[in-house]
């Protein structure tokens, strides 16, 4: 897959194009230019390190939405075995913006649930761009209650711009579905591990993100509203999105300082989409450790900690 570069990555894109051209020349001729290719590769890596070491919140928001980032089904394929997808909410329909089912994690049976976006236009429309309707959240809750019934740990992956705000979704009880998930997740009698892998958009993310451990990938975001949405409300223009992103505190390191996130999972150089394999290794190492810890904690303590976590959200201070 040809890499897609964001606007602030254009200097990296130019170097990558030069490297590709030199590789083509080397393949088509007897000239040895491997030293020059190696020099440009090092220059590209150094430039990438420099750019990504000082990303603004607005740029991190762009990375979190990168079209080539790994999605929930990519994590399921890499981290789990024997995945059996389960469908439908048993009330209205099957929402393809939420995927989930039974799987094995290191041989242990678990329930995995997550948002799913699409890669191409047809799939994006089918998945509703990762924005669940009420039936998606009710499907997620049905799966998590099934996990509770059989004593299976729950692992969730969060990546959504937010819950779908359409008329039909509101008519079918979007806010009720989200609220019910929050209520039920606080008392689900099995370990719950949550990982934000891309966008963590408001209640649409929180509805599957109440857990014993909440993780974020290094360049993911988590916020009550998108920077563009916030800017449109406060300044009546989306052009102020960068200012909104700065004020909202949407980044993983900022949220960890506020004790809203347990672990910030390091991403490969250039973001998770640049090296799926390394990303999966990093995520798996964290989930293995947390699952072991969660299963060693008495259930009453686990539930108490989880409830205290959600009740601590929304702290403020007066200057």
From Swiss-Prot:
Q: Which Pfam families match?
A: ACCA
Taking every annotated instance into account, which residue ranges of this chain make up the domain CoA carboxyltransferase C-terminal? 39-293
Listed InterPro entries:
Acetyl_CoA_COase_a_su (IPR001095), ClpP/crotonase-like_dom_sf (IPR029045), COA_CT_C (IPR011763)
Give the molecular function GO annotations: acetyl-CoA carboxylase activity; ATP binding; carboxyl- or carbamoyltransferase activity
| Keyword annotations from UniProtKB, A to Z | ATP-binding, Cytoplasm, Fatty acid biosynthesis, Fatty acid metabolism, Lipid biosynthesis, Lipid metabolism, Nucleotide-binding, Transferase
- In which compartments does the protein localize? Cytoplasm
Role played: Component of the acetyl coenzyme A carboxylase (ACC) complex. First, biotin carboxylase catalyzes the carboxylation of biotin on its carrier protein (BCCP) and then the CO(2) group is transferred by the carboxyltransferase to acetyl-CoA to form malonyl-CoA.
Protein name, please? Acetyl-coenzyme A carboxylase carboxyl transferase subunit alpha
């Amino acid at each position: 897959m040809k890499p897609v570069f964001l606007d602030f990555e254009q200097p990296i894109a130019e170097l990558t194009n030069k490297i590709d051209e030199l590789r083509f020349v080397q393949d088509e001729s007897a000239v040895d230019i491997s030293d020059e290719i190696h020099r440009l590769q090092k220059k590209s890596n150094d430039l990438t390190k420099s750019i990504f070491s000082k990303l603004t919140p607005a740029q991190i928001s762009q990375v979190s939405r990168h079209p080539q980032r790994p999605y929930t089904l990519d994590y399921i394929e890499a981290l789990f075995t024997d995945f059996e997808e389960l469908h439908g909410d048993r009330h209205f329909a099957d929402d393809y913006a939420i995927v989930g089912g039974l799987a094995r994690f290191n041989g242990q049976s678990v329930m995995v649930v997550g948002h799913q976006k699409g890669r191409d236009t047809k799939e994006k429309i089918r998945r509703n761009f990762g924005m669940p309707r009420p039936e998606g959240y009710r499907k997620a809750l049905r799966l998590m209650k099934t996990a509770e019934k059989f004593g299976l740990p729950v692992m969730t992956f969060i990546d959504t711009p937010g819950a779908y705000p359409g008329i039909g979704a509101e008519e079918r009880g979007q806010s009720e579905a989200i609220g019910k998930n929050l209520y039920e997740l606080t008392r689900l009698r099995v370990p719950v591990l949550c990982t934000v892998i891309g966008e963590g958009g408001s209640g649409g993310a929180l509805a599957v993100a109440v857990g014993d451990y909440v993780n974020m990938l290094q360049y993911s975001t988590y916020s009550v509203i998108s920077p563009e949405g916030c800017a449109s409300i406060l300044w009546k223009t989306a052009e102020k999105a960068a200012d909104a992103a700065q004020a909202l505190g949407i980044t993983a390191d900022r949220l960890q300082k506020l004790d809203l996130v347990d672990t910030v999972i390091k991403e490969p150089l250039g973001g998770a989409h640049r090296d799926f394999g390394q990303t999966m290794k990093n995520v798996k190492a964290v989930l293995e450790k947390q699952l072991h810890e969660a299963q060693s904690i008495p259930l009453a303590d686990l539930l108490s900690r989880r409830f205290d976590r959600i009740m601590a959200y929304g702290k403020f201070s007066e200057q």
